[in-house]
């Protein structure tokens, strides 16, 4: 998926978290509806296509389905097709799915996740299984499923004439195409998160050149691996460094809703995920809600990048905690 970058200075953020000011929100008592059952169904439907490895029929079919679902909920949708150099320096075709749901704000909030599956199960104990693709129920489909349910809920509010923020949805492709463990050739840099790199550069170009495709964004929220029964979401380093105010807002909302057991106060090492390129290349402050397990050697769940990343590891309570926190956060004025 990506690599954890260990910076010694990350420890300084431990002091910053305890010093954050608590501010009262005008919507302090509001909870916004979210259906974990619906999100779970969206995840299962993605998994039913098979592994969504770029360039495969399963990938293409799932992408078409995602476009139809977003259109069904009233969003404007298009596929951003392009290519990026992969780990071997070859051009890798990609398809980002970009949608816009107009609300009551001029600047939209970015909701994003990756929708592709990793072609290799690098962390499989058995060597012969390492060349099979990861099904990606949690690593990929879970974030997309939560976003689809949030869009569905927002469309209901909009149909009633109620306030919603304008939202841009970007489902990144080729996030999990990073250098495989078995590769022995010369490795190129920035081999993970190809779709977000492509989108971020295009976004910056559209903004700088005043193109009609430019969509002004307030901030972004990335969802990655948000279905694990034992998930904990720390304040990831890059999120806090580039978008600390929005981290504080989301974690404070989670605490108010009773989800502090998931959204913990721990500060995680820097994680190179899609949000890194949204922050550094696009210049949009973006936070990463990602399950992090420092007690494990990989930093992630035991079944990360294995054949066991399937629906058995998707939990309704975790989906509810994440989905309700995110929709309540973005709808708070």
Question: Where in this protein do the model-derived segments appear?
Answer:
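N-terminal capping segment at the start of a domain
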Residues: 20-62, 73, 297-313
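Solvent-exposed loop/turn segments at secondary-structure junctions
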Residues: 53-54, 83-87, 104-105, 115-119, ...
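Second-shell loop/turn segments in exported
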Residues: 27-33, 48-57, 84-87, 129-141, ...
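A non-catalytic alpha/beta surface segment that caps or lines the substrate-entry region
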Residues: 44, 51-104
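Extracytoplasmic/secreted proteins, especially bacterial periplasmic and envelope-associated proteins
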Residues: 38-45, 61, 65-72, 142-149, ...
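Acidic/histidine-rich catalytic neighborhood of metal-dependent amide-processing enzymes
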Residues: 131-245
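Active-site-adjacent substrate-binding region
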Residues: 81-83, 91, 219, 226-333
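C-terminal motif of bacterial Sec signal peptides marking the signal peptidase cleavage site
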Residues: 16-18
């Amino acid at each position: 998926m990506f690599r954890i970058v260990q910076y010694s200075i990350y420890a300084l953020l431990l002091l910053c978290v305890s010093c954050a000011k608590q501010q009262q929100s005008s919507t302090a008592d509001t909870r916004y509806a979210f259906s974990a059952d619906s999100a779970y169904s969206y995840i299962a439907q993605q998994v039913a296509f098979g592994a969504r490895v770029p360039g495969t029929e399963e990938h293409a079919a799932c992408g078409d389905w995602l476009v139809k679902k977003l259109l069904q909920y009233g969003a404007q949708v298009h596929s951003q097709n392009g290519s990026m150099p992969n780990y071997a320096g070859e051009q890798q075709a990609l398809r980002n799915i970009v949608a816009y749901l107009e609300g009551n704000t001029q600047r939209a909030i970015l909701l994003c996740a990756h929708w592709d599956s990793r072609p290799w199960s690098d962390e499989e104990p058995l060597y012969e299984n390492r060349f099979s693709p990861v099904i990606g129920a949690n690593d990929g489909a879970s974030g997309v499923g939560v976003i689809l349910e949030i869009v569905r809920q927002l469309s209901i509010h909009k149909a009633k004439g109620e306030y919603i923020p304008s939202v841009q949805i970007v489902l990144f492709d080729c996030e999990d195409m990073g250098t495989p463990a078995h590769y022995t050739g010369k490795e190129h840099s920035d081999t993970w998160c190809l779709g977000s790199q492509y989108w971020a550069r295009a976004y910056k170009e559209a903004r700088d050149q005043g193109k009609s495709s430019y969509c002004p964004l307030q901030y972004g929220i990335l969802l990655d691996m948000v279905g694990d029964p034992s998930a904990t979401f720390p304040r990831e380093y890059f999120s806090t460094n580039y978008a600390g105010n929005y981290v504080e807002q989301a974690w404070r909302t989670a605490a108010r809703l009773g989800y502090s057991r998931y959204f913990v106060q721990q500060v995680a090492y820097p994680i190179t995920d899609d949000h890194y390129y949204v922050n550094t290349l696009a210049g949009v402050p973006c936070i990463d809600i990602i399950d992090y397990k420092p007690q494990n050697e990989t930093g992630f769940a035991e079944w990360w990048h294995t054949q066991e990343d399937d629906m058995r590891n998707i939990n309704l309570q975790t989906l509810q905690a994440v989905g309700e926190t995110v929709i309540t956060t973005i709808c708070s004025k």
